[in-house]
């Protein structure tokens, strides 16, 4: 939040090393909003005091009220608060800097191997015919390529990319494999 003495991830990590578990990090327990701080803990050798919230709205409210010091917030939800000086961004977990906040360094630029993004995909039930999958894939590919749509989403801080069915399946599996160790670590992975 804007009242923290940290201006970047290096400041944050130094403070966390000096006084372990003194810095509150808000997230929805068992979700990627908590996982990002667990990844940072592992990458930097620090520990935060984790505080659970039901979702982005509650986390944002807690950040703005100075009830927590850290929160993972997507750019679309946070950009107006960052630009108004009500929230302070410490780093971007995207692989590259974001056009909307071009001066904000990525976590990698700050020395932390931390790439994290909440991504959305469209899926169909198992057994859906190839013709139906291809039909929807074609529609989605067209929408993702539409300049007006991409521009409108970009202004909201939402990055649009398109992956076909096979590429998305591979990407989904790689993402699952990346998050599985963290899910096991916090006890949210249950084997059937």
Regions found by a protein language model. Give the residues of each.
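Mature extracytoplasmic/periplasmic domains
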Residues: 134, 145, 149-170
